[in-house]
Amino acid sequence: MKTQLAFLAITVILMQLFAQTEAGFWGKLWEGVKNAIGKRGLRNVDQIADLFDSGLSDADDLFDSGLSDADAKFMKMFM
């Protein structure tokens, strides 16, 4: 009985340590996904895709697809 109680206590402690470690990892991973897929992240991906899209249709000419100076500086940081 004492062995079972000690085994249970050790198991609970190890599970708590594992859960806290996993929570930190999954939390950081989820935050990165939210930043990449969030409104601003998707908008930036769309603007970058427009830069490399050579076959624009007439409908695309109706919308402003140019980059602002701030966007150009932001992209230069990564190059």
UniProtKB/Swiss-Prot annotation:
Residues 41-79 form a propeptide. The modification Isoleucine amide is found at residue 37. The keyword Hydrolase does not apply. Residues 1-23 form the signal peptide. It is found in: Secreted; Target cell membrane. Keywords: Amidation, Antibiotic, Antimicrobial, Cleavage on pair of basic residues, Cytolysis, Hemolysis, Membrane, Secreted, Signal, Target cell membrane, Target membrane, Transmembrane. Expressed by the venom gland. GO terms for cellular component: extracellular region; membrane; other organism cell membrane. One of its GO terms (biological process) is killing of cells of another organism. Its main location: secreted. Belongs to the non-disulfide-bridged peptide (NDBP) superfamily. Short antimicrobial peptide (group 4) family. This is Antimicrobial peptide UyCT1.
